[in-house]
């Protein structure tokens, strides 16, 4: 049906296989770069010439394995800084090449703007550099996935290439291959190169944008259906559809934030639906044609309903007390049927994603891929 997309299946398979790889030391040298950091500064390789050791870690915001090592990365950085060395965190992904459901384990993507959010939230005190346009560092180092750590000594010879630490104990400094190699290299004049297998998610480049665009096009062609329900049907949905992380959105096309909210919900649903998120939109307008048009513009192929405004009483108890408005109402229920969000007005996309993630509970990092 989609000949161009079918032609890319082999390429997609290669991407999936490459996330578990054994890096080879091919005489890689300390890479040259000129990259922007999350602090707005430009970073060049020669400005670290006085440092004894330089550690470069390729990391992805969206990669759950990268995330699991954040605490250890910070701890290793503290040791390096105290000994006139430095750790550079580098994001090599082109954010436009990510598929929606590849973001299902993260509150943010891999753009420089989202890197700033992650850096601030996690209190990164080391340079966090964006290399998503050209992958200059990962290309020079022949890296294929994140996380991937590289360690260079005073003469800028590569002494380590591989994983950050033990995947089963990602916060254990004693089991960190990277840190133990650093300690050994500091205490030895001999260059002993260490290589370990890396396990993570494939680096996304501009060559992968075509696949991502094809997937987005297929999403845009999904059918958007809408049907009328009554109060009894709404009660049924509220009673029997709250066993999973569930969103309800009560809205009117007249709402000031209607269009933006629908776009946020559409994006959020595409990201998390494969992990089990359920979404019900309920419109209180009488114009079914206009309602469907708004949903189609937002490409919102969830469970969409129209319900007369005088039959929304099952939802009234969830409306915040400090408002006289009924729409737009966003409700997020946990798996245990607790109300996580009950808000009138504009949707806070970042806050919503974080609450959804917390309820979905990230699966064991040993799964590797998702």
Model-derived features: positions:
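Structural microenvironment flanking redox-active thiols in thiol-disulfide oxidoreductases
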Residues: 68-121, 134-137, 259-299, 311-317
């Amino acid at each position: 049906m989609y000949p161009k997309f079918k032609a890319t299946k082999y390429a997609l398979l290669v991407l999936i296989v490459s996330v578990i790889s054994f890096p080879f030391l091919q005489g890689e040298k300390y890479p040259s770069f000129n990259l922007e950091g999350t602090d707005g500064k430009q970073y060049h390789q020669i400005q670290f010439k006085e440092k004894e050791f330089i550690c470069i870690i390729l990391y992805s915001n969206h990669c759950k394995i990268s995330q699991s090592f954040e605490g250890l990365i910070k701890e290793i950085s503290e040791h390096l800084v105290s000994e006139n060395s430095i750790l550079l965190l580098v994001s090599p992904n082109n954010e436009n090449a990510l598929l929606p459901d590849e973001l299902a384990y993260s509150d943010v993507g891999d753009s420089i703007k989202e890197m700033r959010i992650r850096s601030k939230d996690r209190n990164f005190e080391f340079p966090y550099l964006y290399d998503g346009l050209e992958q200059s560092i990962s290309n020079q180092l022949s890296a294929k996935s994140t996380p991937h750590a590289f360690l260079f000594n005073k003469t800028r010879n590569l002494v380590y290439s591989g994983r950050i630490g033990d995947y089963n104990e990602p916060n254990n400094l004693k089991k960190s291959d990277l840190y133990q190699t650093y300690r050994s290299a500091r205490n030895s004049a001999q260059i002993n190169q260490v290589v370990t297998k890396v396990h993570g998610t494939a680096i996304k480049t501009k060559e992968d944008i075509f696949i991502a665009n094809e997937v987005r096009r297929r999403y845009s062609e999904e059918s958007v259906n809408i049907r009328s329900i009554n109060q009894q049907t709404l009660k049924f949905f509220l009673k029997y559809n709250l066993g999973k992380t569930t969103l309800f959105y009560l809205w009117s096309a007249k709402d000031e934030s209607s269009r933006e909210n629908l776009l946020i919900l559409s994006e959020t649903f595409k990201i998390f639906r494969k992990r089990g998120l359920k979404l019900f939109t309920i419109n209180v307008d009488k114009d079914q044609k206009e309602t469907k048009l708004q949903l189609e513009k937002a490409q919102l192929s969830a469970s969409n309903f129209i319900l007369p405004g005088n039959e929304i009483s099952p939802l009234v108890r969830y409306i915040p007390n400090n408002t006289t408005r009924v729409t737009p109402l966003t409700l997020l229920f946990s798996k245990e049927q607790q109300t996580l969000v009950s808000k009138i007005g504009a949707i806070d996309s970042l806050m919503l994603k974080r609450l959804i993630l917390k309820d979905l509970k990230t699966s064991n990092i040993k799964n590797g891929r998702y």
